[in-house]
Each structure stands twice: as C-alpha cells, then as structure tokens.
C-alpha cells in the first residue's frame, strides 16, 4: 500500500481501520506518518490518542510475553533444567530486542517531534507522561547500567510532567490522574519504594475526591476509572496479604484520556 502518499486525514483514517482490524503494527506506521508531518503544530486530541493506542497495544503484547517467559524461566531454574533455561533465555532475548526497538521508536518520536511541538499544558503532560511510560517499560527488563539509565530517564520525564500537571491541570483531570497512577507504579515496581508509591497514589486520590463535584460529564468516566485503579493499587500495596501472584498492579487503562488508549 502506497501509504506514503496518503494525506494526514487519510493516514488517520487508515490508523482507525488498522485498529478495528487489530493490526497495531500498521496502526503505529500510519500514526507515525501523521506525527512526522506536524512539526509546526500539535496533533489533535484524536490523533495523539490513536498514536498512544497503537503503541500501547504493540508494546503491551510484548510486555505480557516477557512476563510469561520470565515466569517459566524462574520455574525451570528452580527445577534445575539448565538446558531449557538456556533455550528460554535466548527466546526472552528475542522479545527484549523487540521491546527495545518499540520503545526506542516512540521515544525518538516524542523527543524529536511531539514534545517540542506541544504548547498546551494538557498535551505537554500527555507526552512527557508517555515518555516516562516507555522509559519505564525499558527499566522493566534492562539490567545494570542500562536499567539505571532507563529509571533515571523515567524519573526525569514523570517529574517534568508532574510539575506541569500540578500547576496547570485540575486534580480530577484524567491525564493528571493517569500520570499519578503510572508514576506511583514506577516507585513501587522499579524503585522498590512502596511508601513513596502509596503516598503519591493516596495524595492524587484524595485531591481528586475533594473536587469530584467539579468533574465535567465528558471526563467523569475516565477520571473515576483511574481513581478506582489508584484505590485498587493502594489496597494491594498496603495489604499484608498482597503476595498473591494473581494480583495485578494497575496502570492507566488502554481506553482513557490519560493514555488515550
């Protein structure tokens, strides 16, 4: 398909088609073309949401694969099956290569096009949060100096987003709430700081609760969903019996204004 010749509107439409067909790699390609054609202006809310959906689905499949393979690897190591462990490590490496390529792709797009062209506080927070998310995904599987670098870059991006969000966005704004949710997950999972994670999540939840009556009808569903996820994580993190492996830490969902997914 000669998609290089498509107009901005046609690429957006093709991205929607690809989403309906669950062909997310192609959805990424269409939305990257859109993003690279708007150096002097911002993406629309719809466009940035489509880009976010595309990448979140592409990365989400690999993150799930990595977690499953890593779990199997631990079990085989426990059984002393070294031959199988060697096979699993090679396979895990293949998934990690794919994860790295995906993260590098969106991070480059964010740094060269999306963050520099953003002017509205909402879009700045959206893209800086996204930048933090993809550095966090790198920190999930990288080791040594690479993990340290990814974690530091995550912190810088989330902190920059937080500074703008606290100054410019209402406590009930779904993008501000989604940032608090994912930032707290970063503290818990990557930095191993449960106290800081709980503090951040609780503050965001409490501030939003106190201003619930100011919620607009259009963002009510998104905001209350993320607030529920914040509360779920707080319950999980503060419980002494939270070691059930079936329990899953919640991140901003695939369909909300904070991630646009």
Swiss-Prot record:
Positions in coiled-coil regions: none
One GO CC annotation: nucleus
Pfam families per the UniProt record, alphabetical: 14-3-3 (PF00244)
Any one biological process term the GO annotation gives: signal transduction
Matching PROSITE patterns: 1433_1 (PS00796), 1433_2 (PS00797)
Molecular function per GO: DNA binding; protein-containing complex binding
Family named by the database record: Belongs to the 14-3-3 family.
The protein's role, per its UniProt record: Is associated with a DNA binding complex to bind to the G box, a well-characterized cis-acting DNA regulatory element found in plant genes.
Protein name in the entry: 14-3-3-like protein GF14-6
